[in-house]
């Protein structure tokens, strides 16, 4: 199995290295990641500047390709051009430093890279670890390898898109894996107002928990319980339930 690995924290991020090491147990790992930090860029794509893959070496051998672009750029360039003659079987994005759950999935460069893989019909998994003072990426990578290994074992997963989140508690002791829907709660809805030396106001985004997590079981609620969460996603944003009704609306140009 040929695995394309990327992330949004950059090619030198510890989460990428930890996941790369574990994914080697599942197959050949090709790493193509952003040259710099790309957190929160969502599904942005580079059109107006060239994408230049730069070989990164460790211990004298090629380790990864670094691209001055977004996570989605890395996957799109890889699948459409770099490895078009050597098909990729699995795209994995992570390990992100911080959870990607609830509505924040839509902001995530980590998840966007996996979505891009799914655009190409390749099974794709985004992996994120709860941010803490002492992130154990190695433990999270083992969890990710085990879950991903089970995902690809099932024919139904082929071409699918999956979002895996690992809470800190799960890296410290045994935890369950909960298959749950994406919640609608929003992390980080607050800003801190400050002033620069010139007296001008500016605002700093704060990473805060959702005010009122939903009562139903979602990724947000189960992460709070210390469970690993796995959510199957899709990128079709159509409101199918409204299509038929809207055809009867008196819509005119």
Swiss-Prot record:
Q: Name one GO molecular function term.
A: exopolyphosphatase activity
Catalyzed chemical reaction(s): a ribonucleoside 5'-phosphate + H2O = a ribonucleoside + phosphate
UniProt KW RNA-binding keyword? no
Q: Which SUPFAM superfamilies match?
A: SurE-like (SSF64167)
Q: Name one GO cellular component term.
A: cytoplasm
- Database matches in InterPro entries: SurE, SurE-like_Pase/nucleotidase, SurE-like_sf
Q: Where does a divalent metal cation bind?
A: 8-9, 39, 96
Cofactor names: a divalent metal cation
**What Enzyme Commission number(s) does the record list for this chain?**
3.1.3.5
Q: Looking at the record's lineage, which domain of life comes first?
A: Bacteria
What are the UniProt keywords, alphabetically?
Answer: Cytoplasm, Hydrolase, Metal-binding, Nucleotide-binding
Q: Does the keyword Nucleotidyltransferase apply?
A: no
Co-factor binding comment: Binds 1 divalent metal cation per subunit.
> Which cell locations does it reside in?
Cytoplasm
Matching NCBIfam families:
PRK00346.1-4 (NF001490), surE (TIGR00087)
Q: What is the stated purpose of this protein? A: Nucleotidase that shows phosphatase activity on nucleoside 5'-monophosphates.
Q: Which PANTHER family match?
A: 5'-NUCLEOTIDASE SURE, 5'_3'-NUCLEOTIDASE SURE
What protein is this chain from?
A: 5'-nucleotidase SurE
Q: Which organism is it from?
A: Rhodopirellula baltica (strain DSM 10527 / NCIMB 13988 / SH1)
């Amino acid at each position: 199995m040929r695995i394309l690995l990327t992330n949004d924290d950059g090619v030198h991020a510890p989460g990428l290295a930890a996941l790369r090491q574990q994914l080697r147990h599942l197959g050949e790992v090709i790493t193509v990641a952003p040259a710099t930090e790309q957190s929160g860029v969502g599904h942005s794509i580079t059109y107006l500047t060239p994408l230049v893959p730069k070989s990164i070496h460790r211990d004298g051998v090629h380790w990864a390709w670094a691209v001055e672009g977004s996570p989605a750029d890395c996957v799109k360039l890889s699948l459409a051009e770099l490895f078009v003659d050597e098909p990729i079987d699995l795209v994995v994005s992570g390990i992100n430093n911080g959870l990607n759950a609830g509505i924040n999935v839509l902001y995530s460069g980590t998840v966007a890279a996996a979505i891009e893989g799914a655009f190409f019909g390749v099974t794709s998994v985004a992996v994120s670890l709860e941010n803490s003072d002492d992130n154990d990426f190695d433990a999270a990578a083992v969890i990710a390898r085990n879950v991903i290994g089970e995902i690809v074992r099932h024919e139904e997963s082929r071409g699918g898109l999956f979002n895996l989140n690992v809470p800190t508690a799960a890296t410290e002791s045994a935890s369950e894996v909960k298959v749950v829907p994406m919640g609608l709660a929003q992390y980080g809805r607050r800003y801190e107002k400050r002033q620069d030396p010139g007296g001008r106001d500016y605002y700093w985004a704060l990473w805060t928990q959702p005010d009122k997590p939903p009562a139903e079981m979602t990724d947000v609620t189960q992460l709070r319980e210390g469970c690993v969460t796995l959510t199957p996603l899709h990128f079709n944003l159509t409101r199918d339930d409204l299509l038929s009704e809207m055809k009867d609306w008196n819509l005119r140009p």
